[in-house]
């Protein structure tokens, strides 16, 4: 069973834009999303508890508060949410994880923005 546990109940979001930053090729999405979180000084909003995600906890810098490896951060002023993960989502966990994220987005009338990298395509004759 998948669940998203909201820890910042006082934040109000109206049809937010969700920036997805899962680790992928070149970590482009992860790095860009982490930059957005830092730039807007976003608040830790919620954590994911999904079957198949590694059972680990993480902490950031000097803050020793343990958090799940997949988290949502929010900026109420900009109606912005960032989906951040310190672990890749396995192929086995992907369907349930995707359903969990999709349900949350539908419930909050959110607009997703997906970030990912692409490998460099070699031109013919290029070494």
Language-model-detected regions and their locations in the chain:
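Mid-sequence, gly/pro-rich, charge-dense loop/helix-turn segments that line enzyme active sites
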Residues: 61-62, 76, 117-127
């Amino acid at each position: 069973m998948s669940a998203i546990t909201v820890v910042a109940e006082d934040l109000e979001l109206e049809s937010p834009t969700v920036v997805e930053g899962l680790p992928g090729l070149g970590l482009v999405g992860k790095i860009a999303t982490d930059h957005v979180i830092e730039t807007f000084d976003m608040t830790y909003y919620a954590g994911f508890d999904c079957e198949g995600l590694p059972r680990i906890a993480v902490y950031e810098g000097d803050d020793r508060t343990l958090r799940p490896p997949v988290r949502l951060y929010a900026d109420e002023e900009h109606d912005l949410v960032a989906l951040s993960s310190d672990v890749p989502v396995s192929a086995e966990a992907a369907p349930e994880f995707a359903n969990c994220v999709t349900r949350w987005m539908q419930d909050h009338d959110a607009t997703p923005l997906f970030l990912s990298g692409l490998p460099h395509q070699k031109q013919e004759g290029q070494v």
